Amino acid sequence: MSTDIATQLKGSRSDVEKVRKTVEAKFRELSGDGLPLRYEVNVLRHICLALKDNLHQNSDLYCDIMGIMLPRVVPCEEKPSLWEAHLSSLRYIHHGLFHQRSIEACQKLYNLIRQQPCRLQEESDYKIYLDIHLTHFNGFHVLLQKQKLPLEATSQLCYALESLGDLFAAMTQRQISLCATLLVQLNESLFGKRSRSFFKSLSFLPSESLAKMFNALLMLLASSTSSNLANLFPECLSLTLALVQIDMFSPQSNQQMSLQLLRMSKELFRQESNLCYALQLMYYYIKLIFVREPTGDFKRTYIDLSSKFQHFFEHKVASHAKEQWLADFLVAIQLLQVLIHQSNSKLQSPFQIFWQQFDGESSPEIYTAHFQLLQTCASLAVNITRSPLGCSCSHEACKSVRRHCILAYGLCALDAYINWKPAAEQRANVSPHKPLLGVVKYSMDVAKTMKCLGPTSVEIIKLVRQLTYVADQVTCPEQMSVLLPLLEPLQKLRPLVADQDMSSLLRRLFKASSHCGDSNIACRIQASYLASITNPARLRSQVCLYYHNLGKKGTEIKRCVYEWHESTPLPFPLTPDQKKQLYDTDFFALLHYLRSPSTAHMESLIRCRTSDYHLVLLARQMRKDDSISKKCIEVHDKLRQQRSLSRMDNLCLGHASVGLLLDALEAQKTKVSTKEITENMFEELLLSKNLWQMNIQREQRLVNYASEAISAFSNFFDRADQEPLSANETSIDWEALIDDAIATANALSSMGYQSEEDDAWLLLLRMGRLLEDRFTYLRALNHFLSQNEVSSRLNLKLGEEVEVAEELLDDLWPQLKNGKFFKRQQTTVMLCFCHLASYYARMECYSHAQLLLLHVEQLREEFPERQGKSDIVLLTLQTVRFRIGYQQRKPTNCRLPTPLRQLDILLDNVRSFCNLSSLDGGSLQLLLSTLVRESTECSANRLSERLSFSNIALHLVLQSGLALRAIEVFLAWLWTNLQMESFDKAQSKLRLIEHCLGIKQLNPTSRPEKEAIKDVAISDLASNMHLLQLVEPIRKQQLLNMASPNLLKMRPHSPNPQLDLDRYITLDVAPANLRENSQLQCLYFVTGCLHARLRFLQRNSEQLEEFYGRAHNWMQEKPPMSSALYPMLHAQQLYHLNYLRFARKHVEAISTAQLGLKMRSRAVDINFEYNFLAQLKTAQLELKPVGQDKPQVKILRRALVFNHSPEDKKRTATGSVSAVKNTASKVKQSAKKAPRFRIYEELELRPPSATSCSSSGGSGTENTPPSDHVDLNACQAIEISDDDDSPLVSTKKTQPKSREKAKPKATSKACKVLTLDNSLEIVETPTITTSTRSTRARLRQPVETPKTATLSSKRTRRQVLEAQAPETESISTRTRHRH
């Protein structure tokens, strides 16, 4: 039969039906105690085999078969094993149906089991029942969690609990005392180490089912014997904790099964005093945490209970510290603390009232007691080795319950502190901080030894988040003092903390650090957070905000963020790239964000620097620090000694060279008062202070620094493609690179070294184009636009650059009014327009140039801050107009002021200069250098002194110690002195130039006082001549063997007049740096030309023939250098021409004049052309003079009268004659012993242009002895006219129209030579008629026209008529230009 049943159970459904019928029939036949059970066990075994083969399709029929058998079987007294086999088979089938997901069959079978009474034949049978009930409970709880059959699952859970109650009652009835084993299985399978969700779902089951199970369990435990108490204690604690969780969520607040269990347990362990007292303490503690209403004595009760706990642990159990029950009790307390602290933040927490009563009055005291309790438990937990209550770590390397317990105590302490909401006055109470820090620090120290912890560990994540929350709640220094001691232990856990969690904590600490009492600690904490930011943009903004907040508080920045981070108690681990990013961000924040960083801050960055590049950039901010300067010198020397330099090395060398350049420029500056800038005190001034060291040799060191910088920067850009920068290199500070390049270019421009400054500005032009820096590009282009001619060496196509600049300007100038540009940028744009106008004027596009200047005027008027002020834009605009005016061949606007008047206006504006931007000061200095050259050229060609620009420029260059610029000013001054024939001043300028060139130092002896002239006659004559005219026209009338009064006493240290002039060409005595520099050679050559002119004017023509010949050859052999001379080239040609006429080499003079006319550049004064024309015509006349009658000796008819004042013009003719008589009488009295004079009369046939222009290019042939032809350089009446309405003198001898009486026509007879002896006779004075000018004519400014430019010298200042003389005698006049 067994074989048939086994086969049929594994067969089809009909076969199983047959088995059911067979079993039903069989049980009708069987009777007795043992046979039904034996047969039933056999059938159950075959059903188990069928389920084993996964044949669960007929599980419902299997349950029907078991439903037939179960009610008919009972335990067999003779065979206990059969009942055990019966229960085991039922358990197997129940488990098998659950595993095979036969839920309905499982429910059906379980109902069959629970419908039968619980029969425990043996004591061990309860285990099978217990296993069946727990399996059924856990299985349907899983279904309930998955929301599958929720109603049925809930019913099955209740059935299981009720069945457990029946089991516990049966055990009590059978007096089975194996409670410890039962509780172990219950805790392992049902209550122990379950989740909160399990207990929450269990608490919501019907209370009747729970009560039935729990009451039966309590009765069973109460009947336990004392022999099993040792094993029962930890299980009771475990069950208590489970019931506490059930009570937490139970809707019936008065149930509190955990307290019932503890009351029963106290009775159970009453013989064990320590265990009983421990359970009693736990009972009261749990009772206190389940308080449902606020009580007035809660704080006192809790403090008292905590003190009892501490007393119990410290005194009563001191001798039992290592016993197992104490370890279990400490673990139980830890688990209980975890329970009550986990729910403290929930609004509907069952312990909400418990935690609420911690607040209010005496809040610090109760929290102190709570923290002390946790600290005491944590300190005793060190003796825990094992405990069944302890959590089982999933990590194989960690089996320590002790470490997890201690860590849990620390987390609970932090939870309690987070829950604390102290009042404002309670925050200052730090009494709870000590026990809190004790337990937390201890737990953190233990955590670092745990091998199971990592970035994903729950404990570490919770610890960091708790600290984050604590930091977020900081509102005072006392609360911040809780966090500070925890930072160092936390740093030891840093490898276990995830970067995201640490970043969040550091962010809260960053905010909380504002309440830190120690500013240094606050900076360290803030640095930790800043280091944790990996996003470059966010890091930059946060670092800048950090410095902004420090500056807002007025706190001095002592260290950089990078250095603070290195010393912080909680450093953020950084990779080398992240460290570099942090330092670079901190570094550039100081450079670009902080306006005036502290020295300590910059020194901190220097200490932490990773390359020399950082040092040289910071040195730009620390020019006055000697130690930094020494370090820069060391870097500079080190880089110069290296054979090959990388791109970054070149960049460092460039910045270091600029730093040394600026330091040297600053060191040579001195204060010079404007009162000291007087022409007769120049030599004494240069011998004072540190100006005596001002020479080209000293300045060459500065030029070398600047050249090194430009060369290094150029190499950095040239090798960009061959040597790209790697990601590890420091970020390039392009702004600092541009600034230093501009500073170098400005320094070279200020010093005046043309070739070097061209290279610097060309590099800036490239940089502006490559970096798309529009304003740098325009600023560099301004330099080349302002030049008369760009050097071909640069290979610069200026026309193409102008096209690019015009596109940029078209885009920029409409935006200038928006207010988004700085004033220096506005200035750059407007200056570019001005220089473009100058460029187009050189291209003879005068209309376009004037339109550009008009556009600048209109654009400038749109800025209120510039209106009514003399800014650099206005000065540049007026300078360009002045340049266009005095260089233009055919002026188009006749109403423009004359060039000299424009210079006066420009001078007034320079004196009232207003500095509006950082660009204006340097631009003004460069503009003044140009104005010195151009104003000197303009005024010298018009025989006028305009020394104010030279005075201002000299003041600036002397204060800056610029030797080359000083030489240029002295050369311009020397040119003016020679034109005005101030020989002593000219000799002084030569000495000053030689001093600055380093050829001959000035004599440091004091300046000798000028000796008085003993000859009274000569003294009176000199004083009279000085008053009459500063150009000393009477000097040209003295005898050839008489020395000039100005030259009677030469200064001891004047340039040796016998010194060879060829030295200026051969450079025999010149220093080495002068022989190597073409620009210095040009200046030295110009000095020689002016020195030769001085020799000529001093009647010393001994070496002039050879010098002018060699000078001509020098200019022919060196065209680039000669073309760089500009106006001095034409002046030298005029000087040479004067000498040739003096030497009667008229053919050569004519060729020289013609060559000068052909070589005239567009960038020189138009008067040079007129002077060449005048000299050419004069030389032609001298070559073929007009026939002359023999001169007749006549008596002197009148004395020489010069420079009538405007008041004299109002006098009558009689008054004028009287004045002339008085003057002649005075001259006669003062010159009784004076030498003879030779006075020539004017020829009627002499061309007016020859007489009017002969002195424009120089002094003419002053030393030409009397000859058969008329001397063209004879003394002429000086003609100065300010009258705009004065008629122009035509080339013909026509009678001019006048409102006054018409002038008589002069006779056409030739002048006769009059010989005077030592005494002058007073003869009848001719009548003089003066043309009266209107008041309006005197007030108006002269208007220059093309005709007046050439013929203004013909305007008659005064007309002397001799009505009674039969032959009218007229004194030959020598005019000088005044336009």
Swiss-Prot record:
Domain of life assignment: Eukaryota
PTM info: Proteolytically cleaved after the metaphase-to-anaphase transition, C-terminal cleavage product is degraded. Cleavage can only proceed within complexes that contain active Sse.
Region Disordered: start-end pairs: 1206-1231, 1248-1309, 1328-1379
Gene Ontology CC terms, in alphabetical order: cytoplasm
Chain spans, region Separase cleavage-site: 1031-1037
A single GO BP: morphogenesis of an epithelium
Low complexity bias (residue ranges): 1248-1267
Keywords assigned: Cell cycle, Cell division, Cytoplasm, Developmental protein, Mitosis
KW Chloroplast (keyword) present: no
Subcellular location: Cytoplasm
Start-end of Polar residues biased regions: 1213-1228
Quaternary structure note: Interacts with pim and Sse. Cleavage of thr contributes to inactivation of Sse.
Name of this chain's protein: Protein three rows
Organism field: Drosophila melanogaster
Gene expressing this chain: thr
